[in-house]
Design a protein with these regions (language model features):
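Phosphate-binding site recognition
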Residues: 1-252
Length: 252
């Protein structure tokens, strides 16, 4: 009897579309979309503890904004997933934003390793996975060969995991943003989930390794320093002008 009265609860962390497809409870926070994307700031950071719904919020942003690559500017998918939510009541905002922007969404939650080399490879794998979603741009007649070459490189996991190619990793967001602007004529929205994880993990491992190798005078704790250099280059796009429509980051 009770099972017919209540919806199921989500059993594990899920993205917005997965949650909607599951028929589970969903607390309508779609009005946050307008709050965030009409804010005067072009870079916003949300800091909350784990399990506070940051990832769900970011995937909701992505689902609402992203252009349908098969039918650009068609909003039928958004109308499906956001049916019955408050944001659809704001027709003017939806007309301007819903399904109208290319979106780059990346989570850095898995960037970890006991050594910098291991963490670098995880970082490269994460970026390559995201870049591979945009390989359809290789068939575009709007991109030149240099732009297509950049996408091919950052989509190639074996190539990107080699540290001698770290400049491609550092510039991967610029490569994607430039290609998406060329394709759609709109600067993309950048969503970075758990932006602080790589540096937090690097700091932890440096502290641990200092204790572990305290008697080894040749040991140098440079994991965190190397990660700072990598992150600085990767996030460099946030300082560029006329590259992104808006950037949203989450972290603890």
């Amino acid at each position: 009897m009770l099972s017919s009265l209540f919806l199921p609860l989500p059993e594990s962390p899920a993205g917005f579309e997965e949650l909607k497809n599951s028929g589970s409870y969903f607390v309508d926070k779609t009005e946050y979309i307008k709050t965030v994307f009409t804010d005067s700031a072009t870079v916003l950071l949300f800091t909350r503890p784990r399990r506070f719904g940051k990832t769900l919020l970011m995937t909701m942003f992505e689902s609402f904004l992203k252009i349908n690559k098969d039918k650009p500017f068609d909003t039928s998918l958004q109308e499906k997933y956001f049916k019955g939510t408050r944001i659809l009541e704001d027709t003017e905002f939806c007309k301007e934003f819903m399904g109208q922007y290319p979106v780059i969404e990346i989570s850095l939650k898995d960037v970890d390793g006991k050594t910098y080399d291991d963490a670098y490879k995880m970082f490269a794998s994460t970026v390559s996975s995201v870049a591979s979603k945009f390989k359809y741009l290789l068939d575009s007649n709007r991109l030149d060969e240099k732009e297509k070459g950049g996408i091919s490189r950052i989509s190639d996991i074996a190539f990107l995991r080699e540290q001698e190619n770290s400049d491609y990793l550092k510039n991967s967001l610029r490569i994607l943003a430039s290609a998406l602007y060329r394709e759609y004529g709109k600067y993309p929205v950048l969503l970075i989930d758990e932006y602080d994880v790589p540096l937090a993990n690097a700091s932890y491992h440096d502290t641990t390794n200092k204790k572990l190798y305290s008697n080894d005078k040749s040991f140098v704790a440079d994991y965190h320093e190397n990660m700072v250099t990598l992150i600085k280059g990767f996030f460099g796009i946030l300082k560029d002008k006329n590259t992104l429509t808006r950037t949203v980051l989450t972290g603890c």
